[in-house]
Every structure is written in C-alpha cells, then in structure tokens.
C-alpha cells in the first residue's frame, strides 16, 4: 500500500535545470574567466552544489576558498528570470497528496545552498515531511531512499519516487522503490531514450497526469 511519495526538485517540481546550468556557468566565468559549456556542467550533475562547483573550478568541494557563497548569489540572481515559478499545479498537488494522508518528501541532488531558496520561492516551505539533499562526492539517491524508509518506518513498496533523470530510475530500481519518470520538463525529450531504456515503473509527460495516477494507485 502506498504510504509516501518523494519528489525530486530540478525538472520535476520546477523547470530549474537551465537555472542550475547557467548559475554554474556564470559563476565559473566570474571567478575564473572561463565559460564552461552547458554539456560540461550537465556531465557533473548527480553530485551536489559543492561537488559540481569544485569540479568546474578544479577545486576540492571542502576547500574553504570554494566560492559557494558567490554561486548562491548568482543562483538567486538568475532565479526569478530563468525559473520564476514551479510547474503549474505543483504546490496544489503537494497539498492534495498530504491531504490524502500520505507522507511527502523531497530528495534532491541539490544541497541546502540552492534547495532552500527554491523551496521558499516556490511557496513550498512546510509542505515536505522530510527533506534529503545530495552529497558532493557521489550521487547518493539510493542511500537517501533507504534513509527515508528508515525515517518513515516504511518498506520499499510503500514509497513512490517522482524524478526526471535516468539515474533516478537506476537508483530507485537499486533499492526496490517504484518511480514515476517525470517527463514533462524542457529537458525531457533529450533524455527520453535513456529513461525508457531503464524501464521506469511509470512515465508521465504532463504534470496534470500525476494526481490521477496517485489516486489510482491508492484505490
């Protein structure tokens, strides 16, 4: 029986992938004078804020000189232009899911540096029963899903994850959690083949399809 739903952020609750990419590119340019290609930035996704920034600048993620504060300033500066609002119906969906008696979580590759500003801007503060963030050393979503199970006292088949990336599908399969492949973002078409090859349990191309599926799974 479904008891909890955990959401990814970037490309799932908001079309924020371009925001993230451009914030990393602009920060790298301002700090080092080098403008990395979007593909270089995307190739580092999966690890968290400090990991990506360190990779672009040739620095360790735990280097005290890593300009993480500068990155956050750039991220927030670009936010209202590149990703001003969440996907239509996202906030209402979170509230509706909670009203059904389900636990609602957020599991994102972001760290608090960028997760917190986006949650606040999108009016989602207080809507998550659990917030789990990424690590700068490796993609840890499978570990975080296990942590969510322990925190909520739930089995893998009682939790559903909603995420857009091919690696999200891999990590869910690894720990036995069902996944809805969120294929409604601007980057979904580019990743469609990779996502389908990993056999997600469900794949939706419109956010409006999410609630009806959840209702069906609860019946």
Model regions and ranges:
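Acidic, Mg2+-coordinating phosphoryl-transfer loop and its flanking beta/alpha structural elements
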Residues: 160-202
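Surface-exposed amphipathic alpha-helices with a cationic face
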Residues: 91-98, 169-173
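Short amphipathic alpha-helix with an adjacent loop that forms part of the alpha/beta core around
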Residues: 210-219
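Short acidic-hydrophobic, aromatic-tinged amphipathic segments that line or gate anion-handling sites
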Residues: 202-209
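N-terminal helical cap/lid subdomain that shapes the substrate entry/recognition surface
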Residues: 2-9, 13-92, 100
């Amino acid at each position: 029986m479904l008891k909890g739903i955990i959401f990814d952020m970037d490309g799932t609750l908001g079309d924020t992938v371009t925001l993230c990419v451009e914030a990393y590119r602009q920060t790298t340019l301002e700090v080092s004078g080098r403008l990395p290609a979007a593909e270089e930035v995307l190739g580092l996704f999966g690890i968290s804020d400090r990991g990506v920034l360190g990779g672009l600048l040739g620095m360790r993620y735990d280097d005290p000189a890593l300009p993480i504060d500068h990155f956050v300033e750039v991220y927030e500066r670009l936010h209202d232009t590149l990703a001003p609002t969440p996907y239509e119906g996202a906030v209402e969906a979170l509230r509706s899911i909670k009203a059904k008696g389900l636990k609602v979580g957020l599991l994102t590759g972001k760290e608090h540096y960028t997760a917190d500003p986006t949650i606040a801007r999108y009016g989602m503060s207080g809507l998550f029963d659990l917030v789990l963030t990424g690590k700068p050393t490796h993609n840890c979503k499978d570990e975080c899903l296990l942590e969510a199970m322990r925190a909520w006292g739930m089995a893998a088949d009682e939790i559903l994850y909603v995420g857009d990336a091919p690696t999200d599908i891999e990590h869910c399969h690894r720990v036995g959690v069902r996944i809805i492949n969120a294929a409604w973002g601007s980057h979904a078409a580019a990743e469609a083949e990779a996502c389908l090859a990993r056999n997600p349990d469900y794949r939706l191309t419109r956010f409006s399809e999410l609630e009806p599926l959840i209702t069906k799974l609860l019946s």
